[in-house]
Swiss-Prot record:
Name the UniProt record assigns to this protein: Adenylate kinase
Record note on domains: Consists of three domains, a large central CORE domain and two small peripheral domains, NMPbind and LID, which undergo movements during catalysis. The LID domain closes over the site of phosphoryl transfer upon ATP binding. Assembling and dissambling the active center during each catalytic cycle provides an effective means to prevent ATP hydrolysis.
Residues that coordinate or bind ATP: 12-17, 127, 168
Start and end residues of each stretch annotated as NMP: 32-61
Species annotation: Prochlorococcus marinus (strain MIT 9215)
Length: 182
């Protein structure tokens, strides 16, 4: 069974949900970069202080700093890990591959949760978050297409990509993922 996994997909495709389910059933470490950054801030670590300062200025946390935090969590691995929503661009993917080679934990499979854009927008609007207006959702999807979609070809070229139809019920998607992990 594969133990080093990555979930890719547009905002609202179900990456976090599927990653969390899988991490619970397999005791894998679930690494979501947003949660990792918040944890560093909450723990008031040296990296957390840097991250908080950057975020307070309204700036984006650098790829280098995010990778440092991801790396320090990957080396804690004992059973397996799942990266959720990282990397977000080709530069991050190349840097991540270097780190994974260095720590001898190569990526084994990338699950791409594929979902039609209109279904995605409807799903996000139903979440009921204040910042989830149709306009902001479309903007986020456009940014995703420009920066993250090239990763699909990148991981396909590395023979790591598995397509998952994310326009189905939770159980069916989860079952499909488990089959492709074997």
């Amino acid at each position: 069974m594969k133990r080093h996994l990555l979930f890719l997909g547009a905002p609202g495709a179900g990456k976090g949900t599927q990653a969390e389910l899988l991490s619970q059933t397999n005791s894998y470490l679930h690494l979501s970069t947003g949660e990792l950054l918040r944890k560093e801030i909450d723990m008031n670590t040296i990296l957390g202080i840097q991250v908080k300062d950057i975020m307070n200025r309204g700036e984006l946390v650098s790829d280098e700093l995010v990778l440092k935090i991801v790396r320090q969590n990957l080396v804690k691995d004992n059973k397996g890990w799942i990266l959720d929503g990282y990397p977000r661009n080709l530069s991050q993917a190349n840097s991540l591959n270097e780190v994974l080679t260095e720590i001898n934990q190569p990526l084994e499979v990338v699950f791409y949760l594929d979902i039609p854009e209109e279904v995605l927008i409807k799903r996000l609007l139903l979440r009921g978050r204040k910042d989830d207006t149709e306009k902001t959702i479309r903007t986020r999807v456009d940014i995703y297409k420009k920066t993250t979609e090239p990763l699909i070809q990148y991981f396909k070229d590395l023979s790591l990509l598995e397509y998952i139809d994310a326009d189905r019920d939770l159980k069916t998607i989860s079952s499909d993922i488990k089959q492709k992990m074997a």
